[in-house]
Amino acid sequence: MSASNEKWIDGLQFSSLFWPPPQDSQQKQAQILAYVEYFGQFTADSEQFPEDIAQLIQSCYPSKEKRLVDEVLATFVLHHPEHGHAVVHPILSRIIDGTLSYDRNGFPFMSFISLFSHTSEKEYSEQWALACGEILRVLTHYNRPIFKVDHQHSEAECSSTSDQASSCESMEKRANGSPRNEPDRKPLRPLSPWITDILLAAPLGIRSDYFRWCGGVMGKYAAGGELKPPTTAYSRGSGKHPQLMPSTPRWAVANGAGVILSVCDEEVARYETANLTAAAVPALLLPPPTTPLDEHLVAGLPPLEPYARLFHRYYAIATPSATQRLLFGLLEAPPSWAPDALDAAVQLVELLRAAEDYDSGMRLPKNWMHLHFLRAIGTAMSMRAGIAADTSAALLFRILSQPTLLFPPLRHAEGVELHHEPLGGYVSSYKRQLEVPASEATIDATAQGIASMLCAHGPDVEWRICTIWEAAYGLLPLSSSAVDLPEIVVAAPLQPPTLSWSLYLPLLKVFEYLPRGSPSEACLMRIFVATVEAILRRTFPSETSEQSRKPRSQSKNLAVAELRTMIHSLFVESCASMDLASRLLFVVLTVCVSHQALPGGSKRPTGSDNHSSEEVTNDSRLTNGRNRCKKRQGPVATFDSYVLAAVCALSCELQLFPFISKNGNHSNLKDSIKIVIPGKTTGISNELHNSISSAILHTRRILGILEALFSLKPSSVGTSWSYSSNEIVAAAMVAAHVSELFRRSRPCLNALSALKQCKWDAEISTRASSLYHLIDLHGKTVTSIVNKAEPLEAHLTLTPVKKDEPPIEEKNINSSDGGALEKKDASRSHRKNGFARPLLKCAEDVILNGDVASTSGKAIASLQVEASDLANFLTMDRNGGYRGSQTLLRSVLSEKQELCFSVVSLLWQKLIASPEMQMSAESTSAHQGWRKVVDALCDIVSASPTKASAAIVLQAEKDLQPWIARDDEQGQKMWRVNQRIVKLIAELMRNHDSPEALVILASASDLLLRATDGMLVDGEACTLPQLELLEVTARAVHLIVEWGDSGVSVADGLSNLLKCRLSTTIRCLSHPSAHVRALSMSVLRDILNSGQINSSKLIQGEHRNGIQSPTYQCLAASIINWQADVERCIEWEAHSRRATGLTLAFLTAAAKELGCPLTC
């Protein structure tokens, strides 16, 4: 048999098989088929035929000429796929041992590559597929890595036996694990170029099947005989037979991921295209189309980590539509393919985030998270139903629960040095991160993508994403009905991330792309509030939770580092715009004070020493004639100390600027940023120049933020006309705190004065002058109110108020105890507004325990201390994340003096200056614009009736102008101010829950007369507020009379006002406006009703200063015969109208309705 075989090979040596192929295609095809048929005659001897073919191939190659044998070998494999191994094996053996070099256009490689073209041999479609599969199977199994060794003694490493192959493999593993050997040993898969060109020529179906087989996904090429080691002519390289991994299917490829990566990398390196990558990733991630006959060959989703570099390249070049289909296909895959598709999607994001630094020649786009994931998630959630919608929501929850997936971690910027660290080195991690431009661009692009996902799919999707975000951060329980999450998330909840400043930093960029007042902005603000609260809980833990403390020397500075870093970043760094930074700092201050003032809040940082309340309250010193309480360090003190230190430090730095400028010439300082430091251009001078430039920018920013905080701009969301009154109250308290912080710090005022003199920088000088003027004007206003408010409060102490409510503590209340009176009224209003008693009790305990500084009598305590405890009111209606309490606000305000005056003064200025807002059609409330300020002032009066109402009376007496008709702009402004003042007084008198405020307002008889003067000077706009004031006055008379002898003098004053305005009110009965006529009728009814009190009713006097007062007959209201006066005024008005020829229709109907019919 052997001799026979040798004869047929020998007989071919001088045949046309080794000649160039004929030019005629038909003749060529005939010769090829003839030789293929001839070869087929000798395949029966399965042992000898492979050896003969190998001998034939070894004698033919390498060859530089095109011969017929090239296409005969390829066509033989096509016709006899079962013998493909016998043909391919000798060729690849020559490649592995270095005898034959691969060339795409060389021989016989070009013939085998053309075999894979879908246009050839169409009549053999089934055999063609089998042949392609066999060729790829053999090439892949022998495409083992070979290491090029530079050391001479390693040239002969491994032989072709299996034992030697195994030992060689172990040596390779050791070499891979040894760092010092890595530079010398470079892995190379010698058959990858051939496989790459074959796959590029093959149709997509062949490519996909190949990648699934290599990845262990599907056994498409499971058939085939035994594989043997390649035959090597020389001992170069390490050709080995494949060693299958125990964990892979029988038909899988050892290290299939390495084969796939090698093939795809080869294409990129040689052709700079990624067509194979585009085919490989969907083939690996998506379940293959199967039939019942081949379902058993599907193994499922392969491990993703080995393909990280492949995914990185794919997502760098893929279109969003392609990646969206890929993501949906993965999320909707059946459990048989991916038991946990959600975990697979999350792992894919993790791999891409970790692969951002790959130096593969193709970098991910900066907005890859948006293009390939967030955009698809938003689209899926907009479908509202289906597997993709639910799994996309779950994927979003998982991504948000792991913030490092959403934004690049800060490790990208490690090792970066900063040359300028202003203000004591408070340099945040954000600044260090932004030193890497790629990180900044990625954060910005991702933030823009988040904003797009939130706003591009409608309000329903936006609301759902917001609730998912809050649930992922632990702000909402997963079981809440507001959180619409798939069962897969609720059943296996994740631990929420630890809220911190570094976690929230990237979200600041999202703010810049969100519409003002959107639900998304409110969501981010709630997350910010929760973040600040979490920082404060860590920095200043509650008293009960601090069981074990570290030594103060070790942790004192670390305890407040995160809080100070956050404050520093917002004040001077560019992590947020100036407008956003001022809003966030507003929240920081209010949350700090709320944490410090609420029950259980600690004012000591972690690691500080314990002090008893007696030590704090008793240790005081007299400063500037005022008793100032020495307070412990708390979050507000941390905020204040930073502001004071920053302003003073920047002022000192800028004062040095003119001295180091060129020749000290101030005329050259117009453009302060571009000043050139004199002297040689050295590193020191450049560093000094950078330091001065930074100081100028920081000063501009911090002054702008302080000016914004002082301008009563509420914190968070909404347009300027939709702020709640509670937010306006909080804004006023923040402004008062900032004002008094500067007023009580002489160095800080000196620093502001110095900044005013920086004429070389117009912005700094202007802002400093504006801020200094606002603080000075506000301080003078508060001082004036303090001095003038004492007579009004003294009048209240001489007018005890009787209430029908049951007493809280004692039946007899000392009239001089105004604080107890306010506390009693506050408690009653709390119950009316639905606040729980325990919260009020806690607030009272805070005051009684000395944690909140209090004032007594006429003593004026430190306003800086009071402001720290008082600015604790945070909105509850729109920003549910705020933990402030209105109950606590009222309880603390009732004990304060100057701060209450300060807040009233600021709110008054806002009342006067607020623009008039047009009512919107979709508005559900008529209270907009300046009317919200009226509500805010009413809240302050409810919290501290005596002091707040006294301050309002003083401000109203100063700003109320005469009612003179003028058509110019100044006249219109004057009327506008008067209307608002009258509206405010009417609202305050309508609130009968604050008797002290009612007494003070009713006692201001001159103010009430001026407020109701000139009722008919102008039209309806001015008459209506004045009639409202008369209406509430008439109702107040009825209430005050029931107090007994204590209310006689007050009722007399109000009755005199009504009598003075009676004739004008009767005249309004004939007004052309129906609204005015109706309101004047209401006023007259209330006047007549108050006159029906039994004049003979005797009211026993109360104990006053321990002395029983004599019996007094209360005739305050009934001594006036209102019925007769009304009838007389109606007759006079009728007579006047007859005399002038005016109609009596309206007047006659009103008189009849009032029981005072006109006589003909």
UniProtKB/Swiss-Prot annotation:
The induction text for this entry reads: Expressed with a circadian rhythm with the highest level 8 hours into the light and the lowest level at dawn. The peak of expression in long days is slightly lower, shifted later and the decrease is slower.
Which BP terms from GO are recorded?
Answer: cell differentiation; flower development; regulation of circadian rhythm; regulation of long-day photoperiodism, flowering; response to stress; rhythmic process
* Alphabetical UniProt keywords: Biological rhythms, Developmental protein, Differentiation, Flowering, Nucleus
Q: Which GO terms describe its cellular component?
A: nucleus
Compartment list: Nucleus
Transmembrane residue ranges: none
Q: Which parts of the sequence are annotated with region: Disordered? A: 158-188, 600-629, 800-830
Polar residues: compositionally biased ranges: 158-169
Where are stretches of biased composition, namely Basic and acidic residues? 170-187, 801-812
The organism sits in which domain of life? Eukaryota
Name the InterPro entries on file.
GIGANTEA
Q: Which family does it belong to?
A: Belongs to the GIGANTEA family.
Q: What is the documented function of this protein?
A: Involved in regulation of circadian rhythm, and in the control of the photoperiodic flowering. Acts as a suppressor of flowering under short-day (SD) and long-day (LD) conditions. Activates Hd1/CONSTANS gene.
According to UniProt, the name of this protein is: Protein GIGANTEA
Q: What lineage is this protein's organism placed in?
A: Eukaryota, Viridiplantae, Streptophyta, Embryophyta, Tracheophyta
